Design a protein with these regions (language model features):
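Non-ligating segments of multi-cofactor redox enzymes
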Residues: 1-141
Length: 141
């Protein structure tokens, strides 16, 4: 997962914050639109996955994500991204590793309908990261 560091202010009063930027698991995902033969696809639960067998050698997939959430694994010769720890969720885990490991509880996972998410977005002052991309992401910051 990419983590963006933001610095505000000037010495001696500097504020540093960090913004996690995982795969946004978009409804209108450019990576799905631009991939061929369902190399990148969305599961019924909304998790966007790259098929490792179909993606082998397909470096162009890296550039399809406007958020920069897909990277090239040189060793495996394939694009990779956050899988939302789908393999663990399928084994009964309640949350992905990043949420479990976050020492400040800054990361949360919520399974909610769109109307519920809008309410949560307002009450917690959440925002869509880079709304100009118009990808309908399911990750809010």
């Amino acid at each position: 997962m990419n983590i963006m560091r933001k610095e505000r202010g000037q010495y001696p009063k500097v504020d540093v914050s960090y913004l996690p930027l995982p795969c946004m698991h978009c409804d209108d995902a450019p990576c799905i639109k631009k991939s061929q033969d369902a190399t990148v696809y969305k599961r019924p639960d909304g998790i966007v996955i790259i098929d490792p067998h179909k993606a082998k050698g397909r470096k162009e997939i890296v550039d399809t994500c406007p958020y920069g959430a897909i990277w090239w694994n040189e060793e495996k010769a394939m694009p990779q991204k956050c899988t939302f720890c789908v393999h663990l969720l399928e084994d009964g885990w309640k949350q992905p590793r990043c949420v479990q490991a976050c020492p400040t509880d800054a990361l949360t996972v919520v399974c909610a309908e769109d109307s519920e998410m809008q309410t949560l977005k307002k009450s917690e002052l959440l925002e869509v990261y880079q709304p100009q991309f118009k990808t309908k992401p399911h990750v809010l910051t």
